[in-house]
Protein backbone atom coordinates (compact mmCIF):
# COMPACT_ATOMS: atom_id res chain seq x y z
CA UNK A 1 0.00 0.00 0.00
CA UNK A 2 1.63 3.30 -1.09
CA UNK A 3 1.91 6.09 1.49
CA UNK A 4 2.12 9.82 0.78
CA UNK A 5 3.04 13.06 2.52
CA UNK A 6 0.91 16.12 1.82
CA UNK A 7 1.85 19.79 2.01
CA UNK A 8 0.00 22.21 4.28
CA UNK A 9 -2.56 23.00 1.56
CA UNK A 10 -3.21 19.29 0.91
CA UNK A 11 -2.67 19.81 -2.82
CA UNK A 12 0.61 18.06 -3.63
CA UNK A 13 1.39 14.52 -2.55
CA UNK A 14 4.89 13.09 -2.23
CA UNK A 15 5.27 9.35 -1.97
CA UNK A 16 6.95 8.08 1.18
CA UNK A 17 9.59 5.55 0.16
CA UNK A 18 10.10 2.29 1.98
CA UNK A 19 13.61 1.81 3.36
CA UNK A 20 14.11 -1.94 3.78
CA UNK A 21 16.01 -3.29 6.76
CA UNK A 22 19.28 -4.77 5.55
CA UNK A 23 19.74 -7.22 8.40
CA UNK A 24 17.48 -9.32 10.62
CA UNK A 25 19.45 -7.94 13.55
CA UNK A 26 18.17 -4.43 12.85
CA UNK A 27 14.59 -5.63 13.11
CA UNK A 28 15.41 -7.58 16.26
CA UNK A 29 16.95 -4.55 18.03
CA UNK A 30 13.94 -2.39 17.15
CA UNK A 31 11.36 -4.94 18.30
CA UNK A 32 13.17 -5.83 21.52
CA UNK A 33 13.51 -2.14 22.46
CA UNK A 34 9.75 -1.69 21.95
CA UNK A 35 8.43 -5.14 22.83
CA UNK A 36 5.72 -3.97 25.21
CA UNK A 37 4.57 -1.20 22.85
CA UNK A 38 4.39 -3.46 19.80
CA UNK A 39 3.20 -6.76 21.27
CA UNK A 40 2.38 -6.16 24.93
CA UNK A 41 5.10 -8.60 26.00
CA UNK A 42 7.95 -8.61 28.53
CA UNK A 43 11.49 -9.09 27.26
CA UNK A 44 13.35 -12.06 28.74
CA UNK A 45 16.38 -12.99 26.62
CA UNK A 46 18.06 -12.58 23.23
CA UNK A 47 19.66 -15.51 21.41
CA UNK A 48 18.40 -18.21 23.78
CA UNK A 49 19.46 -21.70 22.68
CA UNK A 50 17.60 -24.92 23.50
CA UNK A 51 17.79 -28.56 22.47
CA UNK A 52 15.48 -29.63 19.65
CA UNK A 53 14.51 -33.12 18.53
CA UNK A 54 17.18 -33.08 15.80
CA UNK A 55 19.50 -30.14 16.59
CA UNK A 56 19.90 -27.19 18.92
CA UNK A 57 17.52 -24.34 18.16
CA UNK A 58 18.21 -20.63 18.64
CA UNK A 59 15.38 -18.40 19.81
CA UNK A 60 15.99 -14.86 18.55
CA UNK A 61 13.87 -13.26 21.28
CA UNK A 62 12.32 -14.98 24.26
CA UNK A 63 9.39 -13.01 25.71
CA UNK A 64 6.75 -13.53 28.37
CA UNK A 65 3.04 -12.77 28.11
CA UNK A 66 2.05 -11.75 31.64
CA UNK A 67 -1.68 -11.61 30.82
CA UNK A 68 -1.75 -15.23 29.68
CA UNK A 69 1.15 -16.37 31.90
CA UNK A 70 2.91 -17.91 28.93
CA UNK A 71 6.22 -17.78 27.08
CA UNK A 72 6.36 -16.42 23.54
CA UNK A 73 9.09 -17.31 21.06
CA UNK A 74 9.92 -14.65 18.45
CA UNK A 75 11.82 -15.33 15.23
CA UNK A 76 12.90 -12.71 12.68
CA UNK A 77 13.04 -13.72 9.03
CA UNK A 78 14.61 -12.30 5.89
CA UNK A 79 14.60 -15.63 4.04
CA UNK A 80 11.17 -16.50 2.62
CA UNK A 81 11.96 -20.16 1.92
CA UNK A 82 10.81 -21.75 5.17
CA UNK A 83 7.69 -23.43 6.49
CA UNK A 84 6.08 -21.35 9.24
CA UNK A 85 4.13 -24.38 10.49
CA UNK A 86 7.03 -26.85 10.59
CA UNK A 87 9.47 -24.39 12.12
CA UNK A 88 6.95 -22.94 14.55
CA UNK A 89 5.99 -26.33 15.92
CA UNK A 90 9.63 -27.42 16.16
CA UNK A 91 10.25 -24.49 18.52
CA UNK A 92 7.10 -25.15 20.55
CA UNK A 93 8.00 -28.82 20.87
CA UNK A 94 11.49 -27.89 22.07
CA UNK A 95 10.00 -25.49 24.62
CA UNK A 96 7.65 -28.09 26.07
CA UNK A 97 10.54 -30.54 26.35
CA UNK A 98 12.77 -28.01 28.13
CA UNK A 99 10.39 -26.22 30.50
CA UNK A 100 12.90 -26.01 33.34
CA UNK A 101 15.38 -24.14 31.12
CA UNK A 102 12.78 -21.49 30.33
CA UNK A 103 11.88 -21.02 34.00
CA UNK A 104 15.55 -20.72 34.96
CA UNK A 105 16.25 -18.22 32.19
CA UNK A 106 13.27 -16.09 33.20
CA UNK A 107 14.27 -16.05 36.87
CA UNK A 108 17.86 -15.09 36.08
CA UNK A 109 17.01 -12.48 33.45
CA UNK A 110 14.07 -10.85 35.24
CA UNK A 111 15.40 -11.35 38.78
CA UNK A 112 11.99 -12.69 39.76
CA UNK A 113 10.77 -16.01 41.09
CA UNK A 114 8.60 -17.72 38.51
CA UNK A 115 7.42 -21.20 39.41
CA UNK A 116 6.88 -23.87 36.80
CA UNK A 117 3.30 -24.28 38.02
CA UNK A 118 2.69 -20.54 37.50
CA UNK A 119 3.22 -20.83 33.74
CA UNK A 120 0.29 -21.76 31.51
CA UNK A 121 2.16 -23.85 28.97
CA UNK A 122 -1.08 -24.41 27.02
CA UNK A 123 -0.91 -20.76 25.93
CA UNK A 124 2.63 -20.92 24.51
CA UNK A 125 3.02 -19.44 21.04
CA UNK A 126 5.44 -18.44 18.30
CA UNK A 127 5.61 -15.14 16.44
CA UNK A 128 7.44 -14.70 13.12
CA UNK A 129 8.37 -11.14 12.17
CA UNK A 130 9.46 -10.27 8.64
CA UNK A 131 9.40 -7.46 6.10
CA UNK A 132 7.17 -9.65 3.97
CA UNK A 133 5.73 -13.15 3.75
CA UNK A 134 4.86 -15.18 0.67
CA UNK A 135 1.24 -15.95 -0.21
CA UNK A 136 1.99 -19.60 0.63
CA UNK A 137 3.17 -18.68 4.13
CA UNK A 138 0.09 -16.54 4.71
CA UNK A 139 -2.16 -19.39 3.59
CA UNK A 140 -0.30 -21.83 5.83
CA UNK A 141 -1.48 -20.13 9.03
CA UNK A 142 -5.16 -20.34 8.09
CA UNK A 143 -6.06 -22.80 10.86
CA UNK A 144 -8.42 -21.74 13.63
CA UNK A 145 -6.25 -23.25 16.38
CA UNK A 146 -2.71 -22.46 15.20
CA UNK A 147 -0.47 -21.05 17.99
CA UNK A 148 1.61 -19.19 15.41
CA UNK A 149 1.30 -15.57 14.29
CA UNK A 150 2.90 -13.61 11.43
CA UNK A 151 3.70 -9.90 11.71
CA UNK A 152 5.02 -7.71 8.89
CA UNK A 153 7.26 -4.77 9.71
CA UNK A 154 8.27 -1.99 7.31
CA UNK A 155 10.39 1.15 7.64
CA UNK A 156 9.80 4.36 5.68
CA UNK A 157 11.82 7.43 4.76
CA UNK A 158 9.83 9.75 7.06
CA UNK A 159 10.94 7.73 10.12
CA UNK A 160 7.65 5.85 10.21
CA UNK A 161 7.40 2.16 11.12
CA UNK A 162 4.41 0.00 10.20
CA UNK A 163 3.77 -3.17 12.18
CA UNK A 164 0.81 -5.30 11.13
CA UNK A 165 -0.39 -8.81 11.92
CA UNK A 166 -1.35 -11.08 9.04
CA UNK A 167 -4.91 -12.04 9.92
CA UNK A 168 -6.44 -15.44 9.34
CA UNK A 169 -9.23 -15.43 6.78
CA UNK A 170 -12.34 -17.15 8.17
CA UNK A 171 -10.29 -20.11 9.34
CA UNK A 172 -12.46 -23.12 10.14
CA UNK A 173 -10.09 -26.08 9.76
CA UNK A 174 -8.15 -27.43 12.75
CA UNK A 175 -4.41 -28.02 12.68
CA UNK A 176 -5.19 -31.43 14.17
CA UNK A 177 -6.30 -32.58 10.71
CA UNK A 178 -2.63 -32.70 9.67
CA UNK A 179 -1.07 -33.54 13.05
CA UNK A 180 -0.64 -37.22 12.16
CA UNK A 181 1.78 -36.21 9.39
CA UNK A 182 4.10 -34.26 11.70
CA UNK A 183 5.31 -35.56 15.06
CA UNK A 184 5.99 -32.06 16.42
CA UNK A 185 2.50 -30.86 15.49
CA UNK A 186 0.98 -33.98 17.04
CA UNK A 187 2.90 -33.63 20.33
CA UNK A 188 2.36 -29.89 20.71
CA UNK A 189 -1.36 -30.07 19.84
CA UNK A 190 -1.91 -32.31 22.86
CA UNK A 191 -0.66 -29.60 25.23
CA UNK A 192 -0.99 -26.20 23.54
CA UNK A 193 -4.54 -24.92 23.10
CA UNK A 194 -5.72 -22.02 20.94
CA UNK A 195 -9.17 -20.82 21.97
CA UNK A 196 -11.72 -19.40 19.55
CA UNK A 197 -14.62 -17.05 20.06
CA UNK A 198 -17.03 -19.97 19.60
CA UNK A 199 -15.28 -21.91 22.37
CA UNK A 200 -16.02 -19.10 24.82
CA UNK A 201 -19.64 -18.66 23.65
CA UNK A 202 -20.46 -22.34 24.15
CA UNK A 203 -20.26 -21.99 27.92
CA UNK A 204 -22.64 -19.03 28.36
CA UNK A 205 -26.48 -18.98 28.23
CA UNK A 206 -28.26 -18.17 24.97
CA UNK A 207 -29.68 -14.94 26.41
CA UNK A 208 -26.20 -13.71 27.25
CA UNK A 209 -24.99 -14.75 23.79
CA UNK A 210 -27.65 -12.51 22.25
CA UNK A 211 -26.49 -9.53 24.30
CA UNK A 212 -22.88 -10.29 23.44
CA UNK A 213 -23.57 -10.51 19.70
CA UNK A 214 -25.37 -7.17 19.76
CA UNK A 215 -22.44 -5.47 21.50
CA UNK A 216 -19.97 -7.34 19.30
CA UNK A 217 -21.47 -5.96 16.10
CA UNK A 218 -21.45 -2.40 17.43
CA UNK A 219 -17.81 -2.67 18.48
CA UNK A 220 -16.72 -4.17 15.15
CA UNK A 221 -18.51 -1.34 13.32
CA UNK A 222 -15.96 1.04 14.85
CA UNK A 223 -13.42 -0.40 12.40
CA UNK A 224 -9.92 -1.88 12.78
CA UNK A 225 -11.02 -3.98 15.74
CA UNK A 226 -9.99 -7.63 16.05
CA UNK A 227 -11.47 -10.34 18.25
CA UNK A 228 -8.99 -12.31 20.36
CA UNK A 229 -10.21 -15.26 22.40
CA UNK A 230 -8.19 -16.33 25.43
CA UNK A 231 -8.50 -19.14 27.93
CA UNK A 232 -10.68 -17.00 30.22
CA UNK A 233 -12.34 -14.33 28.08
CA UNK A 234 -12.88 -12.75 24.66
CA UNK A 235 -11.09 -9.45 24.03
CA UNK A 236 -11.63 -6.79 21.39
CA UNK A 237 -8.23 -5.44 20.41
CA UNK A 238 -6.98 -2.37 18.57
CA UNK A 239 -3.35 -2.51 17.41
CA UNK A 240 -2.77 -5.49 19.69
CA UNK A 241 -4.13 -3.82 22.85
CA UNK A 242 -7.45 -4.62 24.49
CA UNK A 243 -10.21 -2.19 23.55
CA UNK A 244 -11.39 0.06 26.37
CA UNK A 245 -13.59 3.11 26.50
CA UNK A 246 -11.98 6.25 27.96
Regions from the language model: what does each represent?
Residues 1-246:
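Charged, terminal alpha-helix-loop-beta segments
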Amino acid sequence: MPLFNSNSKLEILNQIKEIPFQLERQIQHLVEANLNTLLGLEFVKSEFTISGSVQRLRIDTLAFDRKNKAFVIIKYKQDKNFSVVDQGYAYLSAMLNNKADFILEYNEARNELLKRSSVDWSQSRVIFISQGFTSYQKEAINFKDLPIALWEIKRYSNQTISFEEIRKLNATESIKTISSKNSDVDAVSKEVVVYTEQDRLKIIPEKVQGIYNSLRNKILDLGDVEIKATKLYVAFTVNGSNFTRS
